[in-house]
């Protein structure tokens, strides 16, 4: 998503062509998702080819451990298979956190996953939470011209990251017109 936004907005070329440069005027959600799909397919192919070149087996399946070194694979349309290995890497991905105090409805209030179902880019948005995903979405949508306000109860973004890096991140976020509301709690939604 980030790479698609950087490409479509022309952000990386602005130091050459000026701050108003963009690859496409009036970027739509369809443009963003189309470019995101292209980036994902391309990057997936690169990683898959690198893994295969290095003799690593890949299996897309539901897996469960039989014992410490054996995995049972269940794939649609194929027989159940067992694989034994000294080392196993489990890549499950992540799910969006859902604060129980926030009434996610998929219409006005979205998780990061649901944001990808938008038909149009919003004119403005508030991002609740200054963790990795919140910061990523705030910066992506700001680059696309959306007015973004990021609210976080903590006094500093990404507390596990070096201060100099965060200072640079905050500078660039503000430069892209992200409003930061740190050390503030969301008490209600309108």
Regions found by a protein language model. Give the residues of each.
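Glycine-rich flavin
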Residues: 1-121, 154-158, 164-176, 181, ...
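Rossmann-like NAD(P)H-binding beta-loop-alpha module
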Residues: 119-156, 160-161
């Amino acid at each position: 998503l980030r790479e698609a936004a950087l490409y479509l907005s022309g952000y990386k070329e602005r130091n050459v062509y000026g701050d108003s440069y963009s690859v496409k005027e009036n970027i739509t959600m369809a443009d963003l998702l189309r470019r995101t799909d292209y980036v994902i397919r391309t990057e997936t192919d690169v990683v898959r080819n690198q893994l295969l070149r290095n003799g690593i087996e890949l299996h897309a399946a539901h897996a469960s451990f039989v014992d410490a070194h054996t995995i049972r694979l269940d794939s649609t349309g194929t027989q159940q298979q067992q694989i034994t290995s000294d080392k196993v890497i489990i890549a499950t991905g992540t799910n969006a956190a859902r604060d129980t105090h926030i009434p996610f409805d998929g219409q006005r209030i979205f998780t990061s996953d649901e944001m990808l179902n938008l038909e149009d880019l919003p004119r403005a948005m508030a991002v609740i939470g200054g963790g990795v995903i919140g910061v990523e979405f705030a910066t992506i949508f700001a680059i696309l011209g959306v007015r973004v306000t990021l609210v976080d109860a903590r006094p500093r973004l990404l507390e596990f990251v070096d201060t100099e890096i965060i200072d640079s991140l905050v500078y660039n976020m503000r430069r892209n017109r992200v409003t930061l509301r740190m050390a503030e709690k969301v008490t209600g939604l309108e």
